[in-house]
Swiss-Prot record:
Originating species: Agrobacterium fabrum (strain C58 / ATCC 33970)
Source superkingdom: Bacteria
InterPro entries: PurM-like_C_dom, PurM-like_C_sf, PurM-like_N, PurM-like_N_sf, PurM_cligase
EC number: 6.3.3.1
Entry protein name: Phosphoribosylformylglycinamidine cyclo-ligase
Main location: cytoplasm
GO biological process: 'de novo' IMP biosynthetic process; adenine biosynthetic process
């Protein structure tokens, strides 16, 4: 008779290792502490995370919340056994959605679910989450690690993130004064970011390349490593530009659905965004995906960011000032288009020129 048979079944016999969970918590504590900021200086492990809005400097705040995941980009991380950066993606997808509304990210919580917990793997993931929190200035105040035998295939896991930010009342974006003739600025992306990876994986499968093969579009990198380049976090440069110039009218985070799905979300119904596709310096990864998969330009534009991770709407007279403010903070900024009148029933995004794939 087995030991468990003599003494009765244990949770471990069912596939849940509480000791592994406790070990992971100890491993991640230094990373979590590194995200402390005014308003959040507690320890993880309580029943809930705490945040003090007054200590963060707000007087009459409106809270803004967002949640998101990393999608099937995680499958590449799992197959390539490289888990250090997907946590950055998780934070980026949430906090970039906050800043487009003019909100400063304040705190973040994560949900990490797996069939069999590997404390080292989990710690690598949370270290990435902490790095994203530091980069965006928000505190990692809690999370959930769920070990669920039978729910996931061996080695698989999923991530979800939850972020809360704030802006003073009356300072939310879009500002409500977007007008015909306003300029659209593009901010360069770092790569594919965290959308469209089911199509990416399909194209890689058709190519016959392994994740460990040299990346055809990135010298000196393996394919998996190059595709796992973390999503760019735009928070601090945008917040600084918002506060210093007071000239940003609207922002749009270019995620799933690309330009046609994301830009109209921040526009009034009588205006459309005219995008000059020739203005985009398309990163090599998108050219490779399009050519290898035979993906047409219109499909690329509604699936990927194609090199533009964020757009900014400003008046024509403020375009130079905002460009200089963002460039000074390390962003690559370029004129992308302008606001034009929209006819009844017309789409909110209009293209001119050709995408240089």
């Amino acid at each position: 008779m087995s030991q468990s048979g003599k003494n009765g079944l244990t949770y471990s016999d069912a596939g849940v290792d509480i000791d592994a969970g406790n070990l992971m918590v100890e491993k991640i504590k230094p990373a979590v502490r590194s995200t402390r900021r005014p308003g959040a200086d507690g320890e993880i492990g309580g029943f809930g995370g705490l945040f003090d809005l007054k200590a963060a400097g707000f007087t009459d705040p409106v809270l803004v919340a967002a949640n998101d995941g990393v999608g099937t980009k995680l499958k590449i991380a799992i197959d390539a056994d490289y888990h250090d950066t997907v946590g950055i993606d998780l934070v980026a997808m949430c906090v970039n959605d906050l800043v487009v509304q003019g909100a400063e990210p304040l705190f973040f919580l994560d949900y990490f679910a797996t069939g069999k917990l590997d404390p080292d793997q989990g710690a690598a993931i949370v270290s990435g989450i902490a790095a994203g929190c530091r980069e965006s200035g928000c505190a990692l105040i809690g999370g959930e690690t769920a070990e669920m035998p039978g729910m996931y295939s061996d080695g698989d896991y999923d991530l979800a993130g939850f972020a809360v930010g704030a802006a003073e009342r009356g300072q939310l974006l879009p500002a409500g004064d977007i007008a015909e003739g306003d300029v659209i600025l593009g901010l360069s992306s770092s790569g594919v970011h965290s959308n469209g990876f089911s199509l990416v994986r399909k194209i890689v499968s058709l190519s016959g390349l392994e994740w460990s093969a040299p990346a055809p579009f990135a010298d000196g990198k393996k394919l998996g490593e190059a595709l796992l380049t973390p999503t760019r976090i735009y928070v601090k440069p945008l917040l600084k530009a918002i506060r210093e110039t007071g000239a940003l009218k609207a922002l749009a985070h270019i995620t799933g659905g690309g330009f046609p799905e994301n830009i109209p979300r921040v526009l009034p119904k009588h205006l459309a965004a005219e995008i000059d596709l020739a203005a985009i310096k398309v990163p090599a990864v998108f050219s490779w995906l399009a050519k290898t998969g035979g993906v047409e330009a219109h499909e690329m534009l509604r699936t990927f960011n194609c090199g533009v991770g964020m757009i900014v709407v400003v008046s024509a007279e403020n375009a130079t000032k905002v460009t200089e403010a963002l460039t000074a903070e390390g962003e690559t900024v370029f004129p992308l288009g302008r606001m034009v009148a929209r006819e009844d029933g017309a789409h909110g995004t209009i293209y001119k020129g050709t995408l240089g794939l």
